[in-house]
Amino acid sequence: MPLDHVVFNQCMAESARSRQVDTMDRKNVQDLLKRFGQAPVPATYDSVLARLVKADPLLTGQKIRLVAYKAKFLNAHEADHGVIVVSAGAWGKATRLAEDEIAAMLAHELAHLERRDSKRMACESLAYVGNTDLTLPSAIRETTRESFSGESDLSLTLAALNQAREKAADARGAQILRLAGYDPHAMSRMLRKLAPPGVFSSTTHPAIDARIRHVLESINRVGNSP
């Protein structure tokens, strides 16, 4: 099932598709908060986020906020309507992230927001289905069904795209750290600290060692440039 690039590019350009992603992401966040309960965001996280956004020229004028939910595990993801969702496990005793590592985690999510990766993933699903009459949630359900049917290699293809996105977000996140005056190597330290099984490692996220190698290579390229 090849990706239809015409459908993909059209989807990315359409404001109606953006509204579909916005509605879908808002519902997902609401469902998450309803399931776990909302948690207060530590002031440190808000101040670090403000520093990162202020330093990033690609986010100028955008209002981005943090939302937290009550869960002991660690997870973070972005929503297309300018929200970064973080589990309270991010500041639990088992995690103990330094400020620059907090910045690294948030910078990774900001990189996803820059690229509109939430919409990009949805438009990829539509482009694989090839039926532009479908809504984006319907296209996602269709590709999910196809991925688990065992009738195609779509699951491997989508996983490869997702893994490439994560590596790109790591590299761009390190650049955002540098722009904000943080050590870009905090990205690799954050990844290493969060390396225990089940954290940022799955079919949608590359192995931690591969991500660390990639981000260090990107930092070195920038550091060695004239």
Locations of the language-model features?
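A Zn2+-metalloprotease active-site environment signal
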Residues: M1-P226
